[in-house]
Amino acid sequence: MKENIHPQYRTVIFHDTSVDAYFKVGSTIQTDKTIEYEGQRYPYVTLDVSSQSHPFYTGKQKTHSQEGNVARFNKRFGRFVN
């Protein structure tokens, strides 16, 4: 079996900058940045979106109503359909 072919698995701090949330997770991601968190130094990765900020997970997603489009279509073209 080959030696030293697996990536290093370590604890990493992920920072969701949009909501200022920090996550301490095991990962193999490579980064040169570090941060002090809870009194220890960890590798640091910034995120734009995570489960703390994504609309699907926060319940703030917008659903588009098709009722207005259908009503507008029927108003314009309903007289032609019979």
UniProtKB/Swiss-Prot annotation:
One of its GO terms (cellular component) is ribonucleoprotein complex. It comes from the Bacteria. This is Large ribosomal subunit protein bL31B. The keyword Glycoprotein does not apply. Keywords: Ribonucleoprotein, Ribosomal protein. The keyword Transmembrane helix does not apply. GO terms for biological process: translation. HAMAP family: Ribosomal_bL31_2 (MF_00502). Belongs to the bacterial ribosomal protein bL31 family. Type B subfamily. SUPFAM superfamilies: L28p-like. Part of the 50S ribosomal subunit. InterPro entries: Ribosomal_bL28/bL31-like_sf, Ribosomal_bL31, Ribosomal_bL31_B, Ribosomal_bL31_sf. GO terms for molecular function: structural constituent of ribosome. It holds the Pfam family Ribosomal_L31.
